[in-house]
Amino acid sequence: MEGSILVPGIQAVKANGHTPGHTAYAVESEGQKLLIWGDLVHAHAVQFARPGVSIEYDIDPKQAIATRRSILKAMAASKSLVAGMHLPFPGIGHVRADGKGRYSWVPIEFAPLSKVENQ
């Protein structure tokens, strides 16, 4: 995925379709990568398994579908972390491909931090 580098480690990536100018942000630090994709997926239970499904709020449904397919494919291949709206708690995880054009969401493991005692 290509885009404009905003500052070192943060790149704006075109994610057109949902709205004009919809943008994802690729963040990289110390060899780790995260894509914050905004509203790329609206109904995770449907659109991971069937990325060709659009919703009423996509201004350009054909472009939204093409963008979703492209980014899902890239994220599954790269195994990078993904964060975005409309994803199950904790809202950050990985995309897994099934090899048949369908995907699944794999959230990261979440555990609360232990309380730090006053010293």
What function would you assign to each model-found segment?
Residues T19-H22, I55, R102, P112:
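A broad, structure-centric signal for solvent-exposed, well-ordered loop/edge residues
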Residues T67-Q119:
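C-terminal regulatory/interaction regions
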Residues H42-D58, G99-I108:
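Active-site gating loops and adjacent loop-to-helix segments of metal-dependent hydrolytic enzymes
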Residues M1-A45:
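Catalytic core of the metallo-beta-lactamase
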Residues E2-G3, V7, W37, R50-S54, ...:
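Generic secondary-structure boundary/loop-capping signal
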Residues Q32, E56-T67:
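Short amphipathic alpha-helical interaction segments
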Residues M1-K14, Q63-S70, A76-K79:
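Metallo-beta-lactamase
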Residues Y25-E28, G38-D39, A49-P51, A97-D98, ...:
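Surface-exposed beta-strand edges and their flanking turn/coil or helix-capping segments
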